[in-house]
Amino acid sequence: MLSLVLCFFVMFLLGVAVVVLSPSPYFSALGLVFVAVSGCFIVLYHGGTFLSLVLVLLYLGGMMVVFVYSAALAADPYPEVLGGRVIWFFVICVLCICFAGYMSFNDFFLDVSVACEGADYTGGIFGAEWLGVTTFYEVGLILVLAGWALLVCLFSVLVVVRGVNRGALRAV
């Protein structure tokens, strides 16, 4: 199971590299999807079921909408592809560092899991994250304020990306 988490960490790092190093917003959006999905699986592995679901909905539901609007307003007829020697060198270095970390800490994680195996763990059905859910839905005002805050963020990004002229109609 640890190797699955390591794969998600590698996917997370590669997604961050694609977002940072990509010259075109289309490929950055693809990297953002990799970062969101792998980060949510890492949170899910550590026991945050509701938190990972909320993060997927926020990243892929809210941030991708803003990213699509931004990409539509700054559309390139011929987007540049991610590539080059520097990027491949970065990818190989990240994979080597992750592999070296996995090999050096592999025995440590096995010792910790063996030590925790004999412990008397009595976990309940409800985790600590459910307390935040009840607080969030107990007062409906918080939900309304969160929705308005996301709407204001969307419009502020659209104003920033709009440009000097007529916004999305400038290509027409």
UniProtKB/Swiss-Prot annotation:
Query: What are its E.C. numbers?
Result: 7.1.1.2
Keywords of the record: Electron transport, Membrane, Mitochondrion, NAD, Respiratory chain, Translocase, Transmembrane, Transmembrane helix, Transport, Ubiquinone
Q: What class of enzyme is it?
A: translocase
Q: Does the keyword Ribosomal protein apply?
A: no
InterPro entries noted in UniProt: ComplexI_Subunit6, NADH_UbQ/plastoQ_OxRdtase_su6, Nuo/plastoQ_OxRdtase_6_NuoJ
Q: Where in the cell is it found?
A: Mitochondrion membrane
Stated membrane topology is:
Multi-pass membrane protein
Q: Which GO terms describe its cellular component?
A: mitochondrial membrane
Q: Which residues cross the membrane?
A: 1-21, 25-45, 48-68, 86-106, 108-128, 141-161
Catalysed reaction equations from the record: a ubiquinone + NADH + 5 H(+)(in) = a ubiquinol + NAD(+) + 4 H(+)(out)
One Pfam match: Oxidored_q3
A GO molecular-function descriptor = NADH dehydrogenase (ubiquinone) activity
Give the residues annotated as coiled coil.
none
Write out the similarity annotation.
Belongs to the complex I subunit 6 family.
Record's function text: Core subunit of the mitochondrial membrane respiratory chain NADH dehydrogenase (Complex I) that is believed to belong to the minimal assembly required for catalysis. Complex I functions in the transfer of electrons from NADH to the respiratory chain. The immediate electron acceptor for the enzyme is believed to be ubiquinone.
- Name-wise, this protein is NADH-ubiquinone oxidoreductase chain 6
